[in-house]
Amino acid sequence: YTTLFRSTGENSELSMNSVVLPKANEIADTRTWLVHGEKNCLSRQLHKSIAMDAGKAVFNGMITVTPQALKTDGQMTNNNLLLGDKAQIDTKPQLEIYADDVKCSHGATVGRIDDEQLFYLRSRGIALSEARKMIIHAFAAELTESLENSVIKTHVLERINQRLSEV
């Protein structure tokens, strides 16, 4: 999916979060472009991918700060979890800044389930498959816990559980 947002008013705020769970040979292609066009704007983006089997997640994100968008504060993060030997992640967070007095950052992480976390949970008597699910849910929790609408939160958690049960 592609999301484009342009802040056209001073002091505008945006929070944009997403989670994708490609599996088998699926490709989840996420593209965001946020243009800060006025002063004192704030944005927070958090995008997470959990690539299973031979699934592939692609993230291309851009924050553009125009010359008049002084005092802008923009942040974009893309965290990725690889769950299959053939799973792939391509991530490209970008900043395009044309103003001097701004605070913007971007970052990306790609990793697998930590063996030490698995060992800790297994040493407490938790089955391997359940321990993996707990770690994956913890990875996604930063997004799911921030959902204020209980109907949407329930739907997202059910969808994550459904995708994980197929692995």
Regions found by a protein language model. Give the residues of each.
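Conserved beta-strand/loop scaffold segments within soluble protein domains that form the structured core
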Residues: T2-I126, A140, L147-V167
